[in-house]
From Swiss-Prot:
It comes from Papio hamadryas. The modification N-acetylserine is found at residue 2. It is found in: Cytoplasm. This is Alcohol dehydrogenase 1C. Gene3D superfamilies: Medium-chain alcohol dehydrogenases, catalytic domain, NAD(P)-binding Rossmann-like Domain. Its cofactor is Zn(2+). InterPro entries: ADH-like_C, ADH-like_N, ADH_Zn_CS, GroES-like_sf, NAD(P)-bd_dom_sf, PKS_ER. It is an enzyme of class 1 (oxidoreductase). Expressed in kidney. GO terms for biological process: retinoic acid metabolic process; retinol metabolic process. NAD(+) binds at residues 200-205, 224, 229, 270, 293-295, 318-320, 370.
């Protein structure tokens, strides 16, 4: 029986309040309106940013259905949708690409005005919601809410991908892989023969290591306080791995001594103010580039001495790896299918969707790189 144009009842993981587990609930998912797409989820990754919402360090309206790294199949489309059709394999995009705003028209930027990151409303782009639970409206997250068997997204927030692609792997291109790989190959534009430092060896940090290697870096120094992550980092391209706890000096001083005054490129993939500063300070004062990738807590600010930049350092930030999402995601999936990079090493656990809380426990314990939930 066709579900097109009808309300669908399905399972979703609802976060009712911060610092509480997810609750598996039956929710109602409304049909897509004009220029919207309803997707049946197949695979979804657990990302640290989702956990930042649970802990309260990343603020978004609650109750909500979180999740933003996923892949699925189009179930239905609203009036006027032209870029996807029912049956297409797709990846939802937490950074949309409307193609019309000033940012989308700028070839060097990707932070589309239609995003729900800067000032989270927890709604679709028209300001309304498509989820209810027991008659109560439930907020969206980053416009895509992938911790649900079905979700509704705007057409500018979904990309059609290769019909042969394995959704349980390419779902990582929806956030973790792209968010780490892009800062190296697209934002910093790492050069062949250069020296790089990557702070944080979770799924995104390891993807940054992969990006540095793909760009031809000669030295890739991986930094983490969890030595259990070093073997995987070396497998993916790190030439050296260091633990800040092994040194009496600040880690930036250690790195400067190792690299004749500082690295060419550094990447902070944790989201802590102290490591953001260490990442900046470890890059060469005259020619280094440092990129902020990790999401810092909403309420914290940094103060810096302007001389740190005056001497010639470049300090950048990257959302979704600097990639224009709707046009870049299909290309990244094609590159994966062409074996230009592998995602297997990033996936350490696969669980049924109902075990979402167990998946978050694995993340918090440092025992997983990426856990994939299967519907």
């Amino acid at each position: 029986m066709s579900t097109a144009g009808k309300v669908i009842k399905c399972k979703a993981a609802v976060l009712w309040e911060v610092k509480k587990p997810f609750s598996i609930e039956e929710v109602e998912v409304a049909p897509p309106k004009a220029h919207e797409v309803r997707i049946k989820m197949v695979a979804v990754g657990i990302c640290r940013s989702d956990d930042h919402v649970v802990s309260g360090t990343l603020v978004t309206p609650l109750p909500a259905i979180l999740g933003h790294e996923a892949a699925g199949i189009v179930e239905g489309v609203g009036e006027g949708v032209t870029t996807v059709k029912p049956g297409d394999k797709v990846i939802p995009l937490f950074t949309p690409q409307c193609g019309k705003c000033r940012v989308c028209k700028n070839p060097e930027s990707n932070y589309c005005f239609k995003n729900d990151l800067s000032n989270p409303r927890g709604t679709m782009q028209d300001g309304t919601r498509r989820f209810t639970c027991g008659g109560k409206p439930i907020h969206h997250f980053l416009g895509i809410s992938t911790f649900s068997q079905y979700t509704v997204v705007d057409e500018n927030a979904v990309a059609k991908i290769d019909a042969a692609s394995p959704l349980e792997k390419v779902c990582l291109i929806g956030c973790g892989f792209s968010t780490g790989y892009g800062p190296a190959v697209k934002v910093a534009k790492v050069t062949p023969g250069s020296t790089c430092a990557v702070f944080g060896l979770g799924g995104v940090g390891l993807s940054a290591v992969m990006g540095c290697k793909a760009a031809g870096a000669a030295r890739i120094i991986a930094v983490d306080i969890n030595k259990d992550k070093f073997a995987k980092a070396k497998e993916l391209g790190a030439t050296e791995c260091i633990n800040p706890q092994d040194y009496k000096k600040p880690i930036q001083e250690v790195l400067k001594e190792m690299t004749d005054g500082g690295v060419d490129f550094s990447f902070e993939v944790i989201g802590r103010l102290d490591t953001i500063m260490a990442s900046l300070l470890c890059c060469h004062e005259a020619c280094g580039t440092s990129v902020i990738v990790g999401v810092p807590p909403d309420s914290q600010n940094l103060s810096i001495n302007p001389v740190l930049l005056l001497t010639g350092r470049t300090w950048k930030g990257a959302i979704f790896g600097g990639f224009k999402s709707k046009e870049s995601v299909p290309k990244l999936v094609s590159d994966f299918m062409a074996k230009k990079f592998s995602l297997d090493a990033l996936i350490t656990n696969v669980l049924p969707f109902e075990k979402i809380n167990e998946g978050f426990d694995l993340l918090r314990s440092g025992k997983s790189i990426r856990t994939i939930l299967m519907f």
